[in-house]
Amino acid sequence: MTTKPPLPPFTEQTAIEKIRMAEDAWNSRDPDKIVLVYTENTKWRNRNEFPIGRNQVHALLTRKWQKELNYRLIKELWAYTDNRIAVRFAYEWHDDSGQYYRSYGNENWQFNEQGLMEYRHASINDLMIDESERKFHWELGRRPDDHPGLSDLGL
């Protein structure tokens, strides 16, 4: 059976590792890769969508990155226990007209014994920003290790 370490029960350090792995995966914007960290029958609430299973999650992510261009994400630990992690995040993107946004949100994750995510509940709000207000300027892909996190940026 496939495992995705770190495995529950989580410590503060392993929760932070799991979060950074998720951030890196989402910053790849590769739905084929991303869905592999979820159970086959994963259940999500993402904004006003409720996908079930990897295929529906893949479709959601594909649509997401067709709309949210030049996507850059930072996640940060909020809380953890046994097999659950709470995360806060922000990401910046622009639409096809060039309008920039910073999206703020919270996620609640639950993992199975193999470290695959069973449940993901996400609440997200979009804030229209000027390009000059952007704070996430690294090259597309993984956030550099020396780039400030959300708290460091005052977010």
Show which residues each predicted segment covers.
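A beta-strand edge to alpha-helix "cap/lid" segment located at domain peripheries
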Residues: 2-10, 59-155
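Short, low-complexity N-terminal intrinsically disordered segments enriched in polar/charged residues
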Residues: 1-40, 150-155
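Short secondary-structure capping/turn micro-motifs that flank functional sites
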Residues: 42-43, 126
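Bulky hydrophobic/aromatic packing residues
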Residues: 14, 18, 26, 38, ...
